């Protein structure tokens, strides 16, 4: 018998989780992610993709059976019936796969068409934005040039006015000089 050992320490109790009922798929997914992230070391079972059902390939060799004619025996009829059922099943499967493939191709074409339309609209909007940007830049340049021209014209006007002032002051000085030396005296004859 085993020797009596010291009693085991009690396991740490897990906190009871509140019962949360997801209202929609997004909330359910969020809850699952939270549950997974509580213990990131735990491995997550990822289910394998189930193989799609496919009918058996047609038999390579078919015995000559009488089929559903009146002279056929019951065993031969059952063989014929099973072969016929499998062939119909295979044809139905091939038709369904062709339809699925056609729908997938249409869907891909539709996606491509929608993508092209979206790219065209984006390009159109981009051109419009670029044009507006260029227009704003041009307006800004014109405004700066106009300000420069105004400054230059103001400076040239100041120069001209200063030159005019200098000429006026010279003329005034000359007039003052003229006033000192009258060319004629009024009242003298």
Curated annotation (Swiss-Prot):
Q: Please list the residue ranges that the record marks as compositionally biased, kind Basic residues.
A: 124-141
Predominant subcellular localization, coarse grouping:
nucleus
Extract the coiled-coil ranges from the record. 89-181
The question of whether Coiled coil is a record keyword is answered with yes
Enumerate the residue ranges of region (Required for nuclear localization): 124-136
State the gene name recorded for this protein.
PRKRIP1
Q: What name has this protein been given in UniProt?
A: PRKR-interacting protein 1 homolog
**Subunit composition and interactions:** Component of the pre-catalytic and post-catalytic spliceosome complexes.
Annotated segments matching region Disordered:
1-56, 113-189
What function does the entry list?
A: Required for pre-mRNA splicing as component of the spliceosome. Binds double-stranded RNA.
């Amino acid at each position: 018998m085993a020797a009596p050992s010291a009693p085991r320490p009690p396991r740490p109790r897990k906190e009871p989780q509140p019962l949360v009922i997801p209202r929609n798929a997004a909330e359910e997914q969020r809850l699952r992610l939270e549950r997974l992230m509580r213990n990131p070391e735990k491995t997550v079972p990822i289910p394998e993709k189930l193989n799609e059902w496919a009918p058996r390939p047609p038999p390579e060799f078919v015995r000559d059976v009488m089929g559903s004619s009146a002279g056929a025996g019951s065993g031969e009829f059952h063989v014929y019936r099973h072969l016929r059922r499998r062939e119909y099943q295979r044809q139905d499967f091939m038709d369904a796969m062709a339809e699925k493939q056609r729908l997938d191709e249409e869907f891909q074409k539709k996606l491509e068409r929608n993508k092209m339309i979206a790219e065209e609209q984006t390009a159109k909007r981009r051109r419009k934005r670029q044009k507006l940007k260029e227009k704003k830049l041009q307006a800004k340049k014109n405004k700066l040039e106009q300000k420069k021209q105004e400054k230059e014209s103001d400076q040239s006007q100041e120069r001209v006015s200063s030159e005019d002032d200098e000429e006026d002051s010279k003329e005034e000085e000359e007039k003052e000089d003229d006033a000192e030396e009258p060319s004629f005296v009024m009242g003298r004859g």
